[in-house]
Every structure is written in C-alpha cells, then in structure tokens.
Amino acid sequence: MQNGANSRSQEYQGVSVDSRYDPQAIETKWQQSWAAAQLDRTPEADDRPKFYALSMFPYPSGNLHMGHVRNYTITDAIARVKRRQGFRVLHAMGWDAFGLPAENAAIDRGVQPADWTYQNVAQMREQLKQLGLSYDWDREVTTCSPDYYRWTQWLFLQFFEAGLAYQKEATVNWDPIDQTVLANEQVDSEGRSWRSGAKVERRQLKQWFLKITDYAEELLQDLDQLTGWPERVRLMQANWIGKSTGAYLEFPIVNSSDRVKVFTTRPDTVYGVSYVVLAPEHPLVTQVTTPEQQTAVAAFAAEVSQTSELERTAEDRPKRGVPTGGFVTNPFTGQAVPIWIADYVLVEYGTGAVMGVPAHDSRDFAFAQRYGLPVQPVIQPTEGAIAEPWPAPFTEAGVMVNSGQFDGLSSTEAKAKIIAFAEEQGWGQAHVQYRLRDWLISRQRYWGCPIPIVHCPDCGPVAAADLPVQLPDSVQFSGRGPSPLAQLEDWVTTTCPSCGKPARRETDTMDTFMCSSWYYLRYSDASNPEIAFTKDKVNDWLPVDQYVGGIEHAILHLLYSRFFTKVLRDRGLLSFDEPFKRLLTQGMVQGLTYKNPKTGKYVPSDRISDPSQPVDPDTGDRLEVFFEKMSKSKYNGVDPARVLDRYGADTARMFILFKAPPEKDLEWDDADVEGQFRFLNRVWRLVQTASQVEATTAADDKAEKDLRRAVHTAIQAFTEDLEEDYQLNTAIAELMKLTNALNDAPMPGSPAYLKGVQTLVLLLAPFAPHIAEELWQQLGGERSVHLEGWPVLDESALIVDEIPLVIQIMGKTRGTITVPASADRDQLQQLAKNSEIAQRWLDGQTIRKVIVVPGKLVNFVIASP
C-alpha cells in the first residue's frame, strides 16, 4: 500500500494516475497501456485449467447496438473473473462478414462488398475496443477473408468426400422482373420482392445440400448431455429435429398398380381414414387427377406454388384443397377413399402425402368440416362414448371401435398390432421419421464463400484442385439477372482437375451459416496458414466452456455447429462430441417506446414535449408507452456511443450488468445509468480517501472485526453469485453493500479498512476494468489489477462473536441486547432476565413462562394481575 499521496497525480510505470475521475481520459489511457503490454494475449498450454469464453460474433453492420454491448460485456466479465481465478483463458472476437447487406450496399451505393464490409469491420473493432473488452485481437477472424474461407471450402470438401454434400432440385423464390433468386428475407408479407415489387414465384433449381439428417438421432440424443444449456433451448432443438415414431402405410390407387405411401404416427386410426391428401407438387398428382378435375387441380397447384412454406404450414391459417377425382383403397377396410391435394402438405416433408382422419385429428377435422367430408370415429373414450355427430375430434388414447379385428383393444396396444399386421400383409412397415430436413446451403449470391466444385461434362462434380477458390474483384452489381458470378465467363470457365478437359465452376456460394458453424474452432489456431486448426490445439481449448448469445440463434446456428462438430469428429479432426458446454442466452435490451394506437405509428422520444402525458405531436392522440426491443423502426434505440461519450464505458458496463439478470430482458433507463455513474464516483472518492490517509492500528477491535466480516462476506457472496448462474447483477449489489460498509467505517486507515478498499477494487475490476485499474495504481499496486489473483475468502472472518437478542414481554418487543453468539438456551434466558430492559419491565411481575428462540429472541410471559 502507498499512503500519503497528496499530489493531484502520480506516475505508475510511466502512466499518469489522475486523482479526478475523468472516465474518457482514464479509459483511453488504460486501453492503450493494455494493448502495448498485450495483457489479453492467450497463454500457451500449461498446467492451469483452461476456460474458453465466447460471444456469438457479429455481422459487421458498421455500428454496435446495445444488444451487442450486453452480450460482449457479460462474456468479458466472465472471462476476466476466470483469468483472475487461475484459469488460462481464450477470449477472442471475429466477424460473420458474408451476407446479403453487402450486396445491397453494392447495388444501392455503387461500392464493392469487400470495401463496404472491411470499412464496417474497422469501425466496429474500434467501438469494441472502447468498451474495454479483453479480446485477444491476434486471434481475430473475418469470414470473408480468403485466409478464412479457404478453410470453409476445405471443410465443405470434407463433407463432400464423406458423401454428406450433394445436389438435388429444390424450390427457390424467383423474382420474374429482376430474373433473380431471392432470399426469404427479401420477400415481404404479401409475397412480393422487396426491390422490384413483383409477385414472387416458386421455382425448382439444382441446389447443394448437407446431409444433416444422417445425424438426426445423435443430435437429438446428445441434447441430454447439454446440462449447461437452458432447458427451453434444448426443447426448441428437440422440436426442430422432430422425431416421430409411427409407420409407413400404403394405399393402392384405384385402377392403377401404384400406391400412395403415407407416414403416420397414429396407425391406430387407419380404419377412420376418410380421405388422402397429396402435396400439389407430388409426382402422382397428374396420374390420379381425372379429366374433369384437371383445370381445378392445375389452378390450385399454380396458386399454391406462389405461397411460401411458412404461410402454407401456419397453424392459424385455414387449410385449403381441391379433390383430384381419383381414389385409393384403404387396405384395412377395402373402401374407396378420395384423393385431394391441399396447401398444408409439403412434398419435401415425409412422403408428401398424408391420410385424413377427421375424427381423431384437429387439422383433419377442420378440413373435413370445410369440405363436407365424412367423420368416422374409430376410438372411443375408455369411460363412456361420444354422441354423434362428433362436436370435436377425440385425440386422446381410448378403446378401438369400428376397427375390425382390433375392436376392444386399447388404442395404445392396437398401434403395435396394426403395424405388425400391415407388415405381414405387405401394406406398410414401422418407421421413425424426423421433421429435420437436409441443410440447403446454396445461395445464388456473390458475397458468400464460393462452393469449391468444378462441373465437368465427363466427370460430374469434382472437388476444386487449389484452395481458396477466390471471389473475383471489381464485380458489377445490377440487382437483376443471375448471380454476378454466373455472369463472369472468365471466372466460370476452368479446367477439370480430374481429366483436364474444359469445365465450369460452381457459381452458387454457401449459406453464411457454413462460416459461423466452425469459427469457434478456428480461434484455437487462428494464425495457422497450413490447416484450419491442429488437432492438439482444438482438443486443448474445445469445447467452449461458456457460450453467450441471443435466443434467436437457439436452433439453426447452434444445431449446425453441433452437426459440424460431429462430422469433423467422425473425420478424425477433433475428439469431442459437442462444441459448447454451457450456453447463456442473454435477454433483449428494450427501449421506452411511444406508439399511436389509432394510427399504429411510432413516435420518436425527442418529439415528446411532456413525457408524463405523451401525445402525438401530429395528431394530438394520447400515446401508448411501453418497453419493447430496441429497433430503428420504433425510434426506441440508444446509441452506445452517446452513453460512452457522456458516462464512459465502465458506467455502461455496470448498468448493463446490474439492471437485470443476464438471461432476462433489460429495460433501458437513463436514470439508472446515471445511478451507476454516481456509484463509480462514490468508489472513486472512497479510494482517494484511502490512498491519502496514513495507515493506523485498529483502535476499536469490535469495529475492525465487523468490517473484516463485511469484506469477507462480500467476497463469499460475490464469488458464489458468479460460480454457477453468473448472477452478475447481485454480485454488483454486493459491491454496493461493501462500499456502504467502508464509507460507514469509523476508522479510515485501519488494516481492515485498507484491506477492504483493496478488495472492493479487486472485485470491481471484471465489471469496470478501467476505473479499477486506475484506482489500483492509486492504492500502490505494483502490476495491473487484472493480473492480481482473486480475493481469498477467510472463513474465520465470517464467524460472529456477538449477536443481537430481542427482549419481548408478552410478545411485544421492548428492546435488544448483545449476547455471545455461542450462548445456549439457559444462558440466553439468564442474560435476558438480567438485562436492564427486562429488569425494568419485569419489576414486581410474576414470570409464568419463558420462551427462548436461540439466536433471535427471549419472550417473558407474565401472570395476569
């Protein structure tokens, strides 16, 4: 400790330490100092345990938003704590840099996607550094860099060689005016192109897929291993994989040798089938449609082809269809059943055909009601029967009726018997089906990772000979026609690596999820020019110990990353099954929002003259006021730069961490930001006092013990808050309690006081790293506070020598005395009876009974006069 420092500033290792809290000056100074000292550089492997802290990397839009700030601040606090607790920590950052916005910028602004992207990366990198985030910038990755995407291409070839990458026809969104393929996000709610306004068509194009379905069962089963993930995320993934156990059943087409094959999870209802539905795109539609129905069927199929899959399968959307005029035979009953086509059946899912059982399925019941189809019940409740006509479908287990030889069985028992009977008769077989479909990775875009395939007339698709297959520079963008790559004949024309004959490059690029499905592996060996990662390094650092990101990535990104990990494990490239041990899905940052309920329009807060009675300045209507996720369209965002300019990064970090538990939504409140700034100023003034008073011996032993207890109570509670669930907000509350205890301490300069101030700064450092560093140097620290060990808990300091004891007379509190914490019942009773309080109230009274509650109170019951 260094005491008696009365000058306004002092020197610490060549860095000036100011005695006035100026956050902007302090933060700039220490950020430069840390960078020069490479304080956050990842250590090489040693005997210490490892900890890999990871935030989901951002798309480089050019500006940070508060959601970014929250995500990265949470992860940074965790990483800083783990470093101080003796772990060697990997904490890196990169950029998910391919994607549609860069192409849109190229079209709208006439700039090259690479120039626009790298400019945004540079801008956001500086913004991240201003937050004091402890990243090892030597491990930075940018997915649009050839140094990165050559390995994305190499990994694609690993899938290709394993038979997990293939091409097939698939439906895409087609803009008939611009003559180009659109991503789903480029199609508005009315099914029109966002740029041309054309009604989007659905077309078939040859696309590349990864066979994720080969891993469906393992992806599902291994969710049980992920005990460090939120239960709702595991459930979302399980539902997305969508395992269904049931059977294939085959219905012979009347007057044909072909059959309609359906999958059902309810074979027990097969006797109640009253119609069969094909997807409009099903290959059998043409065959089963009668001449009389051809016009209606063709018109309906054309209409459905313009409807998105999302619309077709929406739960609240009425299901529509038309009859084909054809029939199948129910092999179980021998009855003819009509064949329909309907919009809710998708050709890509299952067999593209379903059996309709209105009596026992809600969707089928609604469809039957709409089109007057018969309802044939084949399962009754175990107790009693349902009167006909059935008011609603019966979807629970029950007893079989109207089901031939299976009548009287429980529906659960009948399932297995009906499947066995179908297998015996050649009508079907048991089957497990998954909702999960193979991953379509083709994008008809320029700004993506090129697929490293050459198409040869003789050899077919062949892996490119040399990687990376680089994107060409200086491409012209019009927003019309095929992908810009497909229009570059010099780039497309190449030589087959196998036979040497003329061939053409694949012009599709990869889904950006391909790049983000393995970036966490690259961080382990980010500068290696020879390989994506070495096995030693990836197995040393992985799996990620703590992953932090938004719930919006709960399914696709996390599922694809898990898939990548399992495939690369099977290719012998790594030795673990799952990429992320623990997952924290931080809540959204919400802003105060003003909305006119009559017009539905949002009003910016700076147009509100009286926030206590907000009205629309244009109409005079009273506005609704509520918190909602920050967005530009709602005018409720807060620019992080504004907060940093006014209060500094440490205040922003403290507010973000204190306002709400990490997993809960956070409501932005300027008053609370101001409150955190005031708290840091209190800590600043406290340290100024501690650094300028002379060290003394303790004059009051009890006060000294009480303060030591407060300090070690804070260490214990703070550490426990961070240990399991990262309750960062309650950890900061402990800092506030400790600050109050130190401010109230009667003996500044005593050993417990000075130790307490040191401890406060050490605990504050992961959350507010700049001010903590400055204050640590003012307290005489000889090295960075971020290199200091974690405060050590002294459990003996928590022992309480004396406790308060309440004295009650007839249940009414009359006062409190101090007693030894070790006193037993008899001693407590005697101490209470002998106290001045009891003597005063019991004088002349007869004690009838004494109630002792150890550690709390003694109650004297006296006789009535």
From Swiss-Prot:
Location(s), subcellular: Cytoplasm
Molecular-function GO term, any one: leucine-tRNA ligase activity
Reactions mediated catalytically: tRNA(Leu) + L-leucine + ATP = L-leucyl-tRNA(Leu) + AMP + diphosphate
Highest rank taxon of the organism: Bacteria
Keywords for the protein's UniProt record, in alphabetical order: Aminoacyl-tRNA synthetase, ATP-binding, Cytoplasm, Ligase, Nucleotide-binding, Protein biosynthesis
Binding site for ATP: K632
Keyword Ion transport found: no
Residue interval(s) of motif 'HIGH' region: 58-68
Enzyme class of the recorded protein, top EC level: ligase
Record-linked InterPro entries: aa-tRNA-synth_I_CS, aa-tRNA-synth_Ia, Leu-tRNA-ligase, Leu_tRNA-synth_edit, M/V/L/I-tRNA-synth_anticd-bd, Methionyl/Leucyl_tRNA_Synth, Rossmann-like_a/b/a_fold, tRNAsynth_Ia_anticodon-bd
GO biological process per UniProt: leucyl-tRNA aminoacylation
PROSITE patterns on file: AA_TRNA_LIGASE_I
EC number: 6.1.1.4
Short sequence motif 'KMSKS' region: positions: 629-633
A single GO cellular-component term on record: cytosol
Main localization (coarse): cytoplasm
HAMAP family reported in the protein's UniProt record: Leu_tRNA_synth_B
Family from the record: Belongs to the class-I aminoacyl-tRNA synthetase family.
NCBIfam families linked: leuS_bact (TIGR00396)
Entry protein name: Leucine--tRNA ligase
Organism: Synechococcus sp. (strain ATCC 27144 / PCC 6301 / SAUG 1402/1) (Anacystis nidulans)
Lineage start: Bacteria, Bacillati, Cyanobacteriota, Cyanophyceae, Synechococcales
